[in-house]
Regions:
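Acidic/polar, low-complexity extended loops/arms that serve as protein-protein interfaces
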Residues: 241, 250-251, 258
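Flexible propeptides and autoinhibitory/regulatory segments associated with cysteine proteases
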Residues: 1-52, 63, 138, 142
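"Short basic amphipathic alpha-helical interaction patches in structured regions
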Residues: 51-56, 105-109
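Short, polar/flexible loop-turn hinges at active-site or ligand-entry regions and domain interfaces
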Residues: 59-61
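C-terminal, non-catalytic macromolecule-binding modules
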Residues: 246-251, 282
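Extracytoplasmic/secreted cell-surface and envelope-processing proteins
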Residues: 49-53, 236-238, 272-274
Length: 315
């Protein structure tokens, strides 16, 4: 799983600058979720399509090995014995009249727990869209609604692959709500606002390197954590983001060690926004053929006799 984690982190740092340019302001996305979904698709790709996907996803093993490692990682993340809730749900929604390859369906079901639900895109695509959105809402405790917008699928849709991630956890060392108070927060060197700020003193793992400081905040159970990276300079955010990659991230996090730390961070809430369009950044990274209707090769997912009915990724 270590190789897979490295691949996911590399994809994260490839995508982050492209997504942040396309969506100014705060940005939240799950590189693991993207990797899981695309690895299922890669397992059904062949030829140039598969080659480009493998390079962009930084996979160094065979598709079967990546799928097996992904399944093990998902199982580790969703261990129900932990005091936190972490769900990773995968599902395939396929046109009931389409000739999907049984080997692909069994592979995704075995590795990802992603069975195929047969649906009617051809003549009932709008009810099917609502069905998929209801499934996502159920898996995410209604946090993600209307994932597929109006006209997001049509009568030509043959397969929708959905990956939903839901996390709920408390800090291992909770912040006292009564100590939350307004404090200045620097949006930029010239723009400071007042925000509710929570604070506490405790023993945390912390590291400083190359103009940034990383702080690890563990969740209850201490198996999962959030790592916050803060530039040392008020105007250092752009430089920190542009220089960070998987190698520097690994060096920074490998240097984490326990110290007594006064932690002061803004109260924040993560909420889903409009769905991100990944086609443009993935094309820019080199995954072009998968989005090309004429040249995409997903013959291991399905190989219909009519070339016009072959699969490609639309979004």
């Amino acid at each position: 799983m270590t190789k897979l984690a490295t691949s996911i982190n590399r994809l994260a740092f490839d995508l982050f600058p492209k997504l942040s340019r396309a969506q100014p302001g705060n940005l939240v996305f799950s590189p693991a979720s993207i990797s899981f979904a695309l690895s299922m698709t890669w397992g059904g790709a062949d030829g140039q399509t598969a080659k480009e996907m493998q390079q962009v996803l930084h996979f160094e093993s065979s598709s079967s090995e990546v799928m097996e490692a992904s399944g093990k990682l998902i199982a580790a993340l969703t261990d129900r014995s932990r005091p936190i809730t972490f769900r990773v749900a995968n599902q395939l929604f396929g046109e009931k009249t389409y000739p999907f390859e049984p080997s692909f369906l069994s592979q995704t079901a075995r590795a990802f727990g992603a069975p195929m639900q047969q649906v009617n895109f051809k003549t009932a695509h709008e009810p099917t869209r609502r069905l998929i959105n209801e499934w996502v809402e159920q898996q995410t405790e209604n946090r993600i609604q209307n994932l597929i917008p109006n006209r997001g699928v049509d009568s030509e849709t043959r397969l929708v692959l959905v990956n939903a991630v839901y996390f709920l956890g408390d800090w291992a060392a909770p912040f006292d709500k009564q100590r939350t108070q307004p404090n200045p927060f620097h949006l930029s060197p010239s723009n400071t606002i007042s925000v509710p700020t929570m604070s506490r003193t405790g023993s945390y793992r912390i590291a400083s390197k190359d103009g940034v400081t990383a702080l690890e905040l563990p969740y209850e159970g201490n198996d999962l954590s959030m790592i916050i990276v803060l530039p040392d300079a008020v105007d250092g955010l752009d430089a920190a983001l542009s220089s960070m990659d998987e190698t520097r991230w690994r060096e920074l996090t490998n240097g984490l060690s326990h110290e007594s730390v006064w932690v002061s961070i803004p109260s924040f809430k993560l909420e889903p926004s409009a769905p991100m369009r990944l086609s443009t950044p993935l094309r820019e990274l080199g995954m072009r053929t998968a989005f090309d209707r004429r040249n995409a090769n997903f013959s291991k997912i399905a190989n219909p006799p009519n070339p016009q009915d072959r699969l490609y990724i639309s979004e």
